[in-house]
Amino acid sequence: MRVGVLSIWLADRYLPFWVSYLQALEVEVVHPEEDSVNLPFPPPIRRVLGQVFSLKSQGVDFLLLPDVQLGVEARKGSPSPWLVDLSATLERLVPGLPPTLVVPAELSPEVAGLAAKIGQNLTQNPMLARRALERTKHQLSSSFTLPKQPGTRLVGVVAQPMLLSDTEWLGSLRAGLAEHGLHLFLADKTPAELRQEGAYLELDLELPTDLEAAGMHRHLSRLGKVKGLLYLHDPQYLPLPNPLRKLLKKSHPSKPWRLVGLEASWTRLASELAKDLQV
């Protein structure tokens, strides 16, 4: 039995437990190889598709995918399918997609029941699944490590959190900012804390990732050491919530800020921000 896993799209939040658990089940965990796809999507979306095509080509039996909304369904509006149903979105784009195992993109003790069910289905051995869960369930306690973010002239980033787990994309943004003496700063609160920050804005947001993005805005706007703000918005794939964008139009942040897409010229953008910050 071989289960493929992604290395992006919030993988750092849920994958450590699932890799340990699958290995304890004596299931082979398959990681994606570098596989670029020539499709008309922004780089972060192409990377997701590239990893999925790579895992498919490696002949995995199942594909482990995250539910980034943690079981919450949107009752209004038409959110991007990339935000609300990654599995169904990939089924439309990847012919012959392996069967998917969808798990919450965050860890908590409540995930144990789902893990037990998946383990029994994969192994057809309830005793093995129970032993594997006993050995690994201590990893279900969600942990958060503050990112090390040295430097001055900090620029905070507000975006859908899936984007901020893409280290390759972040690397290109960091490099562009650094050319003009600026440094990237990611919100230094847990996802749950950011969702609470977002709720304080009373924007009537439903989806956890929308609340998290709104929380980034509130937290970074109030953080004195952050001198500028960068809002990443792609209306088709990774949009910021409409109420947050309306708030930005109505009440501009007190710091220099920009709202840009996923394929902006980071060097040019950094040059503009540096002038505003008088760097």
Task: Describe each region flagged by the PLM.
Residues 1-279:
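An N-terminal assembly and electron-transfer interface module characteristic of large anaerobic redox
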